[in-house]
Amino acid sequence: MSKKILFPQIKGLLHGSDYNPDQWLDRPDILEKDIELMKKAKMTSMSVGIFAWAAYEPSEGEFHMDWLKNIMDKLYENGIYTILATPSGARPAWLDEKYPECMRVNADDHRAHHGFRHNHCMSSPKFREKTGIIINKIIDTVGDHPGLVMWHISNEFGGECFCPLCKKKFQDYLADKFDHDINKLNKAWWTSFWSHTYNDFSQIEPPYANGEFSIMGLNLEWKRFTTWNTTDYMKSEIEILKRRTPNIPVTTNFMQLFPGLDYRV
């Protein structure tokens, strides 16, 4: 069986790092120096755009994409290829202000405020809609760029959301898993202990900090659901990338010894 070479245009190993030129767009002298140092270090690829959503779309529907093409052009002209990220790992403030349902609800049943990163609800249709729009804009701009060698979806997936959307999705997930038979779930989880028997899937809640967390079956299935829902979200990004740029590989980065997700899935 012949082996497929993923990056035939790159001689040797991929050698590079994360690169955030969007933070220095007002300093072309720094950007020029960056490339000089990359060449000195014999770098062959850079991961670009991981947290660049606000640079791409500073306000809703206002897109600034030229800087990305200019950066990729300069990298390519200097023999450096681009691993291009989707920017869903961190959201601009306008998105959270207008669409607060994109922000996660914590285990204490309080919605998070804007800030940090990866605190979005992966069940949110609005979040998926907005990430789809910005991903398509990126593809429109550089999807056929000769320097593009790989897609990098988001960044360091992790965390969980306890919002009403995730609660309903969790209930539907359980109903499908247990053949819509609540008695089968009760038996599997031994809910008769402490009289915690359910009559309907709609009664099941995530393991809130001030709610039901003593049923180990519930805790386990919630962890499984969180991995499943994260994977489902990842597929929504991958589908766009593979449909529009079928010859470009897609990957993401995980975190060593991270207990929040089952990476085997």
Model-found features: residue ranges?
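Short, solvent-exposed turn/loop segments enriched in Gly/Ser/Thr/Pro and often Arg
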Residues: 20, 47-52, 85-94, 149-158, ...
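Short, well-ordered coil/turn segments that N-cap beta-strands
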Residues: 10-15, 42-44, 76-82, 144-149, ...
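Polysaccharide-binding and catalytic clefts of secreted carbohydrate-active enzymes
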Residues: 112-265
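Boundary/entry segment of secreted carbohydrate-active catalytic domains
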Residues: 5-27
